[in-house]
């Protein structure tokens, strides 16, 4: 039996192109892994099965973890199965790659469990058929993600940046989010290059100035809860941004003491919100 940690991701930038002939959208994004995570245990078995001991997630073949296991055995030609156990802490439908990170962890875990010696890069390439965020989650750390998310340019991670993750009690489907962007034709300036430079220089002010997500302009008019969440978080006088297609946001505190203060303030004001302390990880 082995254990894999599935780290959530945030988008420091997310620019979305127009819809392509294949139905997908091209993106340009800086993604970073964070410490908020799910835990997955894997044990050899004759078939593929999944049990969830904490939190909620789809069961059976609807779950990307099961699909990832099927993909692994199909690609490697190995005979066998796996018993998967999930402890779920990453919020679902939050734009944090929760399902994607779980699938990525299954691929990495099976690679270890069966001593398959498949490279991370190959696992990432295989995973693109399951979901656009999964290749990044296989590799983790930090990267510029282009294409539909599968073209990765690794960046040096900026580890241990304190942050807060906030998710109001509203869900946003990714398909609906892209549909709203196409309908409204709203886009913001692409700050990805500025963000990459800020990360290279370890310039916090420049990083904060580069935060950008096209989905905010597309979704805020549709979901007042998201607009109100953003307005409230900005009133705390720290940089904040919605991640992915929502509905989670992250806030960048000035330091760990400020992180503790903001956590207490937000929890007291909004007891029905998911609020978690986290940090960036390598």
Tell where the protein language model's regions lie, with residue ranges:
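Residue-level recognition of strand-loop junctions within catalytic nucleotide-signaling folds
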Residues: 17, 252-255
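Short beta-strand scaffold segments in enzyme catalytic cores
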Residues: 14, 38-42, 133-137, 143, ...
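Conserved, helical-rich catalytic subdomain that frames metal- and/or nucleotide-binding sites
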Residues: 50, 139, 144-239, 254-267, ...
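ATP-binding N-lobe of GHMP and related small-molecule kinases
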Residues: 1-94, 112-121, 157-158, 167-170
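Glycine/serine-rich anion-binding loops at beta->alpha junctions
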Residues: 85-114, 132, 239-253
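Contiguous, small/hydrophobic- and glycine-enriched helical/loop subdomains that border
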Residues: 81, 103, 107-144
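Solvent-exposed alpha-helices and their adjacent loops that cap or buttress functional pockets
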Residues: 32-33, 128-129, 135-138, 155-159, ...
């Amino acid at each position: 039996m082995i254990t894999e940690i599935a780290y959530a991701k945030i988008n420091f930038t997310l620019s979305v192109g127009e819809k392509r002939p294949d139905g997908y959208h091209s993106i340009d994004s800086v993604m970073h892994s964070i410490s908020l995570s799910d835990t997955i245990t894997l044990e050899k078995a004759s078939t593929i099965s999944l049990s969830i001991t904490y939190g909620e997630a789809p069961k059976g073949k609807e779950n990307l973890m099961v699909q990832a296991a099927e993909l692994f055995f199909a690609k490697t030609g190995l005979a066998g199965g796996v018993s998967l156990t999930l402890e779920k802490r990453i919020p679902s439908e939050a734009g944090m790659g929760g399902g994607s990170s779980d699938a990525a962890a299954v691929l990495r875990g099976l690679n270890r469990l069966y001593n398959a010696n498949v490279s991370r890069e190959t696992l990432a390439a295989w995973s693109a058929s399951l979901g656009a965020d999964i290749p990044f989650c296989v590799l983790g750390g930090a990267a510029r993600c282009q294409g539909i998310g599968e073209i990765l340019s690794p960046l040096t991670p900026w580890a241990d940046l304190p942050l807060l993750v906030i998710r109001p009690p509203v869900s946003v489907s990714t398909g609906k989010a892209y549909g709203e962007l196409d309908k409204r034709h709203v886009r913001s300036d692409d700050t990805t290059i500025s963000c990459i430079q800020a990360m290279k220089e370890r310039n916090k002010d420049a990083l904060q100035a580069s935060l950008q997500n096209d989905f905010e302009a597309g979704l805020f008019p549709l979901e007042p809860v998201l607009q109100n969440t953003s307005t409230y978080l900005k009133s705390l006088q720290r940089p904040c941004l919605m991640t992915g297609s929502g509905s989670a946001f992250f806030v960048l505190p000035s330091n760990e003491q400020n992180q503790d203060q903001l956590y207490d303030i937000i929890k007291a004001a909004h007891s029905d919100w998911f609020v978690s302390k986290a940090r960036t990880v390598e």
